[in-house]
A protein has these predicted regions:
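Conserved N-terminal phosphate-binding loop of PLP-dependent enzymes in the Aspartate aminotransferase
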Residues: 1-286
């Protein structure tokens, strides 16, 4: 919005976000999130956000109006169930934003920094955002977040125009640089691709052994999901009892995000535990 006013000299303010999305826990990011369960108790929310179905070109074209200034999207909807759009969706968004003079904002907090096998999840699609948010793997466990932008968009933030208490602190910045150096120079991205493929193939084999329990396996790199025919919590609890930490999102979706340095041997161990958990929790599933 500041870019719209200070750089573009316009008055547009509306941000289009996606249904089923998740963007955070501040008032603005709760508003941007496309899941009602995260909004309860926080009314009144921030005005100027509207939601459209994810990976739906027609719905988005109809939604863009005279007050729209930006489109906010996760390249993969993580909290929403590891929902991957079609390969042409992100290029479509880039083309639409260029045509309508909108800013394209990618939330890569969960899928960025190597998670999908490339440094950023958008890279295989030949497009780039105007603004991107990053966190989680950015500093190897040290709390850090970053909002990065093109030079033209970043010009809207002049010194002192916006800040955060710990923004740019030396500890987090040093940790971020160290983590990026390891990721880029010590084969971490290659391992993400190798172990990610191994994980995907293994999950598909497990799914074939449990056709009554598994609807679908989906994901990219080291963010994978198994959509079950029934509640996922019993499987999560059984896996935990055997030392495997996974989680369940969207009630039926098991989500797998192992460390970026996970080995194929560790993936095999995980798959064995998962296989046993699906077998032992089959009674009453569905």
């Amino acid at each position: 919005r500041r870019y719209e006013r200070d750089i573009r000299k316009g008055k547009r303010f509306e941000i289009l976000a996606m249904e089923n999305s998740f963007h955070g826990r501040t008032l603005a990011t709760v508003t941007a999130t496309g899941q009602e369960k995260f909004k309860k108790g926080f009314d009144p929310l921030v005005p100027g956000f509207r939601h459209v179905p994810f990976d739906d070109r027609d719905a988005l074209l109809k939604a863009v109006g005279d007050e729209t200034c930006a489109i906010l999207v996760e390249p993969i909807q993580g909290e929403g169930g590891v929902i991957c759009p079609g390969d042409d969706y992100l290029p479509f968004l880039r083309s639409l934003c260029d045509e309508r003079e909108l800013l394209l904002v990618f939330d890569e907090v969960q899928v960025g920094i190597g998670r999908t096998g490339t440094l950023f999840a958008y890279e295989p699609f030949g497009v780039a955002p105007d603004i991107m948010t990053l966190a989680k793997g950015l500093a190897g466990g040290i709390p850090i977040g970053a909002t990065v932008a093109t030079e033209r968009v970043a010009a809207a933030f002049t010194p002192g125009s916006h800040a955060s208490t710990f923004g740019g602190n030396p500890l987090a910045a040093a940790a971020g640089l160290a983590a990026l150096e390891v990721i880029l120079e010590e084969g971490v991205l290659e391992n993400c691709r190798r172990s990610g493929l191994h994980l995907r193939q293994g999950l598909e084999r497990v799914a074939l052994r449990h056709p009554d329990r598994v609807r679908e396996v989906r994901g990219r790199g080291l963010i994978q999901a198994m959509d079950l025919t029934g509640p996922g919590t019993p499987v999560v609890e059984t896996c935990m009892s055997e030392g495997l930490l996974i989680n369940c999102t969207a009630e039926t979706v098991l989500r797998f995000l192992p460390p970026l340095i996970v080995t194929t041997e560790e993936v095999d161990e995980m798959l064995e535990i998962l296989d046993r958990a699906l077998s032992s929790t089959c009674q009453g599933a569905g």
